[in-house]
Amino acid sequence: MRSELIIENTGLTGIIPYMYFRYYQAPVASTDLRVEPIVKHHPDFEKFIHGKMYDSLIFQQAFWKEMAMLFDGPKIIDLCDPDWLKYEFDFVELGHHVHAITCSSAELRDLVQRYIPNKIVEHVPDRFDFSLFPKPHGLHHGKAKKAVWFGYTHNAHETLPQLAPRIKEYGLELLIIANEPYSQEDEILALNPSFVKYEHDSCRQLISESDILLNPRSNRAYFRYKSNNKSVIAWKLGVPVAVTGDDIARLMDPDERNREIEKYAFVEKEYDIAKSAQQYRDIIRRIKDL
């Protein structure tokens, strides 16, 4: 018979972040998006403290099988990437030791549901603390001049080159906000893009000052399951999103860019972090009712 951790009904949910098992403190997007704003604004959630009693646990990209086996309260694995496609571990086995799995995109949810059909699997989008966002762009005027991309540099290497012909054709100034400067010898580097090291506040401010946010996709399977958080950030800041070269061509027109402002109200309603906290509460309640 396995040992079990004794659970007290504290009403408190501990969130175990990805960084719990890492020995460096570099910013991690999943923690910034899916842990920090929830524990900041919702006192029934907190970052996991070893030895503290919790009513329920959320493993945010933290694949801690031993704890999942021992802890007897409601348990959720929260996923923002299909890491088992890249790394060697048995995700299905781990999934059998929790009650529910939450995913940052609908595509990832559908994939996980096929792997583990007998568990609660829910889509919990990346959401935000909008009080931290700067003033949005406002109305767009004239032809677009500034395009911006942000994220991890290796993803820029993977996705940005497909947009290089249109960036060059329209003479757009390209700003890359990332962990490291763009270094791949290709058409993007030939455009001599500006570089700013990623920080939350400066990144969002710079996006709000741009005309177009670039968010190209990759054909690789891993990218298929990415969330739409970059687009949501841009829409909240009043900046339109170009996924393809044709989008860039269309968004050179200020009227086309201003049509994107209509998405602002939708983002305000659907992507506030309070909605994620409530989704987790509802899932925990469903688990307790099983």
Predicted segments, located by residue:
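Short, polar loop motifs at secondary-structure junctions
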Residues: 61-65, 105-110, 177-186, 244-247
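A charged, aromatic-enriched C-terminal amphipathic alpha-helix characteristic of glycosyltransferases
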Residues: 29, 131, 254-290
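Conserved catalytic-core segment of nucleotide-activated headgroup transferases in glycan assembly
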Residues: 14-34, 129-135, 139-208
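Donor nucleotide-sugar binding/catalytic pocket of nucleotide-sugar-dependent glycosyltransferases
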Residues: 99-113, 117-135
